[in-house]
Structures are given as structure tokens and as C-alpha cells.
Amino acid sequence: MAPILHPKVGCARPPESQDDAGAKVTLDTGMSQNPDQSLTRDAIRAMRRSYGDAGMESLPADPFTAFHQWLGEAAANEYIVEANAMVLSTIGGNDEITSRTVLLKDISEGGFTFFTNYQSRKAHAIDLNDRVSLLFPWFAMERQVSISGIVSKISEKESDEYFATRPWSSQIGAWASAQSQPLESREELESRFTGASAKWPEGTVVPRPAHWGGYRVLPLTLEFWQGRYSRLHDRLRYEREQTDSEFVLTRYYP
């Protein structure tokens, strides 16, 4: 299937202002003063495009084989930036659902691995509920893969091994950021980075922070979606009841 070229849209950075305490940031895009810049309801409703006819008659019996194939094709597509980017959704306190984009860093031991701060908002949500979902939205290929499953921490050894492969600046950033905690100013963050940089200069071994490491999602469902003409999309879903049972592949109505 020929890739679909999406125009690059440049966005001006909205002006920022701080209150006297320097803690609260407010943004004003000017929409309220210039309502013509905003999209009308009719304009939003009119946003649609026709999908192609690159359908999928079947998939391999093993979902990981299928995923590796699709990920490889996405990575080779010049119009997809970071094919390993996935939307992670978690359920936290008061059943609050939150989503954010993280990067897939490994597919092994029957699961999908990502790394983060263990004191972050997502980590606290995972502590409360180990059911999560992942979404790989490969728009340029009219494809997506959605995954739901059980998440748990990987071993410290695995986290150490991956952390050692990260660029020095990313390693220092893991020490500098108290992820998801209130921040008085950008300068405070930069100061923490400078302090960590002085402690571990570039070229030295930076130890992994105890509060940083990996999680692995063991899937219960993996749905492969391919856009088709007339909204007659293809949906093939692998499902199992337990993380150690066999997958069953079923086609669903779009």
C-alpha cells in the first residue's frame, strides 16, 4: 500500500504568563478574542477521509508474529514518526482513566516492555490496578493495534541493563525529574539537571535510580485494525482468558 502523505502543520507556541508566585502557568491562544480561528461544529463533523482497500484476509496464529510484522512495516514507513510510540491507559484512584504516550522498548517473555519513573502518576495507577491498555496508532498506514492486559515490574537486572544503554543526557534526566510532582519553575528542573550532571559528568557511569525502571504488559487481547473502504474495516482480535492460556483469533464486525 502506498503511504499517505500528511501535510506538516506548523504551530506557533502560545504565550505564557506566570503569576507572582511563579508556580501557575496560564495559556491564552487568542481563540476567545478571535473565534473565527476555531473550528465550527460543522467543520469538525466534515473531517473525514476515504480509506483504501489494503485489507487483511488473515493473520498468523501467533499474535506476536503478527505484531512484529506490522511494527516492522510501520518502522519502514517514512511518514510514521516513532513507530514504537504507544498510548498507555491506566485506571487510578476513583476509577480515573488517564492516557499518555510511552515508547515500546522490548517484546520478550510474552509481553510488551516500557520504562518510566516508579513514582509517576502512571506508576501509582498501576499500583492500584494492574489492568492496562496499549494503542499503536499508525495513521499513515490506516492501521492500529490495541492491546489490553496485565502489567507488572520487570526485574532490576533488566532495568539496569536497559538503563546502561540510554544516552547520558537521558540517564541524567531520570535523576533530575521528580516525575508528576509539582514544579515551581522550569529553572528548578534545569538546576536539578545541572546538579546531576556535575555529580555524574558525561563519560562516567551513571547508576540507575531506584525509582526508575521497566514494566511488562502481558496481553489478554490484541486487536489488529485495518481501515477499509465504506468504513467496512477489518478487525481481527486475538483473545485469551489467562496470560498463560492459548490465544483464539476471531474476526469482528467493524
What positions do the PLM features span?
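Short helix-onset patch at the extreme N-terminus, typifying the N->h transition
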Residues: 7-8, 37
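Binding-site signature for planar aromatic cofactors or substrates
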Residues: 24-254
